[in-house]
């Protein structure tokens, strides 16, 4: 490999690293909402999996504790899935054209 090619690759890698950092900052600002129980339990979190809010409809507070715990877990899992999908969609534009193996997730 020639010096010019190596320098070009290094510059390209540095640019991608800067872009990844910017994307991580953007993902920290994007919020998704997971729901369960037809919207009676809601979890709002960022695409970096930081939970911002948990909302439980007051009608559930008198109900079975185990059921409420299951609904909270389901809403949380729904939010995590939505955050993953959103993150993958945002990152796919950055990784377009890169020869990454199937299932390879960014950021590492």
Curated annotation (Swiss-Prot):
Annotated compartments: Cytoplasm, Nucleoid
Presence of the UniProt keyword Ribosomal protein in the record: no
An MF annotation (GO) of this entry: DNA binding
Superkingdom of the organism of origin: Bacteria
Pfam assignment, any one: YbaB_DNA_bd
HAMAP family, A to Z: DNA_YbaB_EbfC
UniProt record similarity statement: Belongs to the YbaB/EbfC family.
Subunit: Homodimer.
Function: Binds to DNA and alters its conformation. May be involved in regulation of gene expression, nucleoid organization and DNA protection.
Protein name per Swiss-Prot or TrEMBL: Nucleoid-associated protein BTH_I2220
Species name: Burkholderia thailandensis (strain ATCC 700388 / DSM 13276 / CCUG 48851 / CIP 106301 / E264)
């Amino acid at each position: 490999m020639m010096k010019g090619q190596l320098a070009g690759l290094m510059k390209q890698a540095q640019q991608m690293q800067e872009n990844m950092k910017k994307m991580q900052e953007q993902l920290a600002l994007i919020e998704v909402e997971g729901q369960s129980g037809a919207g009676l339990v809601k979890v709002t979190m960022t695409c970096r999996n930081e939970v911002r809010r948990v909302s439980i409809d007051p009608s559930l507070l008198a109900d079975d504790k185990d059921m409420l715990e299951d609904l909270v877990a389901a809403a949380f899992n729904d939010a995590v899935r939505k955050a993953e999908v959103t993150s993958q969609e945002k990152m796919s534009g950055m990784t377009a054209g890169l020869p990454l193996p199937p299932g390879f997730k960014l950021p590492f």
